[in-house]
């Protein structure tokens, strides 16, 4: 399960997700990827499930990059507990995702294999996604870094 090694604060506020992603919104390492089209929280278990789905489909071919990291703790109070008496303890970690954020990247496989692997991964995620290629970003005029 992905989680930070150390954090400054054990509990954080929920916050709000407005606007589009300003960083991580282009393909930096691979040739293909999936990009979020809506905002949401993705838990570390969902990231791991998507990673396993990709790796199972591509088998030993290709390399996969996970471009998001769950750095936000989500607290929960125990079941059947009365209101009050402080905030609950951290239960799991989430990555805050905004529209435009590239979640996973893959290279070393054909486009059809990458498209199917990303489709399987997107079924494990709670946000809507779309398949993107490095060509898409080069056509838009943005320079794409070689990873």
Curated annotation (Swiss-Prot):
It comes from Clostridium botulinum (strain Hall / ATCC 3502 / NCTC 13319 / Type A). Gene3D superfamilies: Ribosomal protein L10e/L16 (3.90.1170.10). Coiled coil: none annotated. It holds the Pfam family Ribosomal_L16. Keywords: Ribonucleoprotein, Ribosomal protein, RNA-binding, rRNA-binding, tRNA-binding. The gene is rplP. Part of the 50S ribosomal subunit. The keyword Aminoacyl-tRNA synthetase does not apply. Binds 23S rRNA and is also seen to make contacts with the A and possibly P site tRNAs. This is Large ribosomal subunit protein uL16.
């Amino acid at each position: 399960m992905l989680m930070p090694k150390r954090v400054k604060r054990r509990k954080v506020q929920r916050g709000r997700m407005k606007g589009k992603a300003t960083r991580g919104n282009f393909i930096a390492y691979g040739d293909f990827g999936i990009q979020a089209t809506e905002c949401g929280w993705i838990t570390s278990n969902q990231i791991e499930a998507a990673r396993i789905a990709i790796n199972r489909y591509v088998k030993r071919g290709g390399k996969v990059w996970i471009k998001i990291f769950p750095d936000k703790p989500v607290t929960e109070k125990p079941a059947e507990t009365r209101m009050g008496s402080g905030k609950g303890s951290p239960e799991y970690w989430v990555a805050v995702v905004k529209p435009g954020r590239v979640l996973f990247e893959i290279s070393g496989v054909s486009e059809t294999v990458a498209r199917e692997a990303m489709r399987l991964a997107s079924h494990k995620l709670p946000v809507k996604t779309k398949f993107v290629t490095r060509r898409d970003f080069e056509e838009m005029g943005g320079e794409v870094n070689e990873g």
